[in-house]
Amino acid sequence: MQLTVKALQGRDCSLQVPEDELVSTLKQLVSEKLNVPVRQQRLLFKGKALADGKRLSDYSIGPNSKLNLVVKPLEKVLLEEGTGRRLADSPPPQVWQLISKVLARHFSAADASRVLEQLQRDYERSLSRLTLDDIERLAGRFLHPEVTETMEKGFSK
């Protein structure tokens, strides 16, 4: 379907996307067309802000719809990220997009959406439960993989 995204400064772009596309994917496309970083974007449809993890169809966005783009000042984005949530809390939207595509091959659109939402909740819960010791162990494995391999070989004998 064809969508028009109009920034408050007057610039706009037309995009061709499927009706069940993720908002995060749409933001990536808008970023490429209008050169507005994803993290500075806030998309609105009929005055309502669109959430990254939702699909366009969740908001009844149909063909030829017009979305408004509010560009958040970089200072505000950095402040929100610093106080509201850590940058590493969530994988890049591309990861969720790829997972969504895999799920779409095996489930109906509604079921795939529910599975993806549950996976995202589980991911966030797992991250929030990591202790500093867990993080230190993970960092050690990434920084010194040869030590981990040696230890694993020692245990397998």
Curated annotation (Swiss-Prot):
It is found in: Cytoplasm, Cytosol; Nucleus. Residues 1-76 form the Ubiquitin-like domain. The gene is UBL4A. The lineage of its organism: Eukaryota, Metazoa, Chordata, Craniata, Vertebrata. One of its GO terms (biological process) is regulation of protein stability. As part of a cytosolic protein quality control complex, the BAG6/BAT3 complex, maintains misfolded and hydrophobic patches-containing proteins in a soluble state and participates in their proper delivery to the endoplasmic reticulum or alternatively can promote their sorting to the proteasome where they undergo degradation. The BAG6/BAT3 complex is involved in the post-translational delivery of tail-anchored/type II transmembrane proteins to the endoplasmic reticulum membrane. InterPro entries: Ubiquitin-like_dom (IPR000626), Ubiquitin-like_domsf (IPR029071), Ubiquitin_CS (IPR019954), Ubiquitin_dom (IPR019956), Ubl4_C_TUGS (IPR041421), UBL4A-like (IPR047154), Ubl_UBL4A-like (IPR044724). Component of the BAG6/BAT3 complex, at least composed of BAG6, UBL4A and GET4/TRC35. Interacts with BAG6; the interaction is direct and required for UBL4A protein stability. Interacts with USP13; may be indirect via BAG6. CDD domains: Ubl_UBL4A_like. One of its GO terms (molecular function) is protein-folding chaperone binding. It comes from the Eukaryota. This is Ubiquitin-like protein 4A. It comes from Callithrix jacchus. Keywords: Cytoplasm, Isopeptide bond, Nucleus, Phosphoprotein, Transport, Ubl conjugation. There is a cross-link at K48 (Glycyl lysine isopeptide (Lys-Gly) (interchain with G-Cter in ubiquitin)). Polyubiquitinated. Ubiquitination by AMFR and deubiquitination by USP13 may regulate the interaction between the BAG6/BAT complex and SGTA and therefore may regulate client proteins fate. Its main location: cytoplasm. GO terms for cellular component: BAT3 complex; cytosol; membrane; nucleoplasm. Residues 96-138 are annotated as: Required and sufficient for interaction with BAG6.
